[in-house]
């Protein structure tokens, strides 16, 4: 892997936030000579993304080393010195020595192992796949919940539908229980008993039914096409009566104009 040293050094010293920082003891690593056994060397480490920088001190302006955390694993290890909280960065490439590091305490050791294990792009890809799977499951669950809610609302609406029984006489008029008589009067054009022929012709079946306290609107005829056909028959009756009266007036005029 080829890197621009100046760009890498600028990134290491830039104001971009670091993912983890702290002092660690080092016993050598990839590309560096092995450190003699003993207490190791104490350096300041800075983790930014998948790049681990080491500095001589916290105030140093030049990084000593760089470890690219790809194709590697981070695991606990034994340090050359007892009572050291050590861990190792092991690479999959053959012949590459592990990078042995040690923290000042167990809490620092666990924090470093967690941060370094999550620094690679491979880990980020796994996280993205898991989040995508959770998002898909959440969307499916939400869709099922909405479908169940709509069914529950529809069922509740049907169970709470108003009762279309005949109202009390105090509230107005009665709705007929048997609509067959209405249809017979309407279809055959039979004049109801007690109604004058002129009134029947002028008002038509629908108007007379309304004046008699009978309404064509019912739960079974709530659609527009049914209501349109119902009141259209009234218009046809009115038009037929008008045509008959017009023919009668024309006949009278002709008879009067004869010598």
From Swiss-Prot:
PROSITE patterns: PH_DOMAIN (PS50003). It is found in: Early endosome; Recycling endosome; Golgi apparatus, trans-Golgi network; Cytoplasmic vesicle, Clathrin-coated vesicle. Pfam families: PH. Keywords: Coiled coil, Cytoplasmic vesicle, Endosome, Golgi apparatus. Residues 161-178 have a biased composition (Basic and acidic residues). Residues 17-121 form the PH domain. SMART domains: PH. Its main location: other. A motif (F&H) lies at residues 223-235. Residues 155-178 are annotated as: Disordered. Residues 124-150 form a coiled coil. Forms homodimers and heterodimers with PHETA1. Interacts with OCRL and INPP5B. Plays a role in endocytic trafficking. Required for receptor recycling from endosomes, both to the trans-Golgi network and the plasma membrane. Belongs to the sesquipedalian family. The F&H motif, an approximately 12-13 amino-acid sequence centered around Phe and His residues, is essential for binding to OCRL and INPP5B. Was named after 'sesquipedalian', an unnecessarily long description of a simple thing. This is Sesquipedalian-2. The lineage of its organism: Eukaryota, Metazoa, Chordata, Craniata, Vertebrata.
